UniProtKB/Swiss-Prot annotation:
The gene is B3GAT1. This is Galactosylgalactosylxylosylprotein 3-beta-glucuronosyltransferase 1. Residues 28-334 are lumenal. Glycans are attached at residues 140, 184, 303. InterPro entries: Glyco_trans_43 (IPR005027), Nucleotide-diphossugar_trans (IPR029044). It catalyses: 3-O-(beta-D-galactosyl-(1->3)-beta-D-galactosyl-(1->4)-beta-D-xylosyl)-L-seryl-[protein] + UDP-alpha-D-glucuronate = 3-O-(beta-D-GlcA-(1->3)-beta-D-Gal-(1->3)-beta-D-Gal-(1->4)-beta-D-Xyl)-L-seryl-[protein] + UDP + H(+). Pathway: Protein modification; protein glycosylation.
Length: 334
């Protein structure tokens, strides 16, 4: 049997700890209980005698709406007279994930100052879905459309590398820029071809804003590699390409890996992407060789060592149950 003094020693050790834990629980829970009590009957929200309670509900809703407007929807940033405008050219086409991808992209572009979004649909007319989405973003945008001929469209799920994607849409955007701005325009700007299935760092847009002729940087998840990049020497000049697929292309670079000064686009009016007679992977070269030489390229992103754009692509949804047992509602826009 334990001795009496052993029991006393245990009590003297346990009792102080019990008291400490009890006090701590009371100090922690008391404010929470007070908060819940206040939520149940907040004296500050009691309707004064003779007042209409509906007026107070409306006032609360107005306050919430003001907060939402001021802190959530105050985008894009105010326009600056000193920053060059970034003209982002995005070809797009109708598919289940189109709205999701354009929404994700818009949420990025809303944080970029002095940005103009040129969205070009591969369609015979501008679709209501894209028109509503662009209008609701609050971005400075232009909505165009041109349909790719049937013989240049993909058939089924197979990807034919000989068939260029988005070429006519990008070319229409180039034509729009040349028709909108005079050839000798002093308007400072940069043109960037940004597909809607990529992920973009905000830092990328500030990197490209200072483009004098053509700036370049790495792109992740392309060419079967973690990333492809321009090869830059110790003097900071582009001397080649870090890629496996046809590294001897004139410009072995992804569409998301370069930006062009607007004045260069306006001055070289013959420069377009080639639709015919161009092998897969040569679309970028077909435009850039009309604008610059390798020696003219300006490496960005810490001499092409930082990844600021990823060719992520949205997973194609598996809609095998769509239309079964009355679950389909075509009126719901996705």
């Amino acid at each position: 049997m334990p001795k009496r003094r052993d029991i006393l020693a245990i009590v003297l050790i346990v009792l102080p700890w019990t008291l400490l834990i009890t006090v701590w629980h009371q100090s922690t829970l008391a404010p929470l209980l007070a908060v819940h009590k206040d939520e149940g009957s907040d004296p500050r929200r009691e309707t004064p005698p003779g007042a209409d309670p509906r007026e107070y509900c409306t006032s609360d809703r107005d306050i919430v709406e003001v907060v939402r407007t001021e802190y959530v929807y105050t985008r894009p940033p105010p326009w600056s007279d000193t920053l060059p405008t970034i003209h982002v050219v995005t070809p797009t086409y109708s598919r289940p994930v189109q709205k999701a991808e354009l929404t994700r992209m818009a949420n990025t572009l809303l944080h970029v100052p002095n940005l103009h979004w040129l969205v070009v649909e591969d369609a015979p007319r501008r679709t209501p879905l894209t028109a509503r989405l662009l209008r609701d973003t609050g971005l400075n945008y232009t909505h165009l459309h041109v349909e790719t001929p049937r013989n240049y469209k993909l058939r089924g799920d197979a990807r034919d590398p000989r068939i260029p994607r988005g070429t006519m849409q990008r070319n229409l955007a180039l034509r729009w820029l040349r028709e909108t701005f005079p050839r000798n325009s002093s308007q400072p700007g940069v043109v960037y071809f940004a597909d809607d299935d990529n992920t973009y760092s905000l830092e990328l847009f500030e990197e490209m804003r200072s483009t004098r002729r053509v700036s370049v940087w790495p792109v992740a998840f392309v060419g079967g590699l973690r990333y492809e990049a321009p090869r830059v020497n110790g003097a900071g000049k582009v001397v080649g390409w870090k890629t496996v697929f046809d590294p001897h292309r004139p410009f072995a670079i992804d569409m998301a890996g370069f930006a062009v000064n607007l004045r260069l686009i306006l001055q070289r009016s013959q420069a377009y992407f080639k639709l015919r007679g161009v092998k897969g992977g040569y679309q970028e070269s077909s435009l850039l060789r009309e604008l610059v030489t390798l020696n003219d390229l300006e490496p960005k992103a810490a001499n092409c060592t930082k990844i600021l754009v990823w060719h992520t692509r949205t997973e194609k949804p598996v809609l095998v149950n769509e239309g079964k047992k009355g679950f389909t509602d075509p009126s719901v826009e996705i």
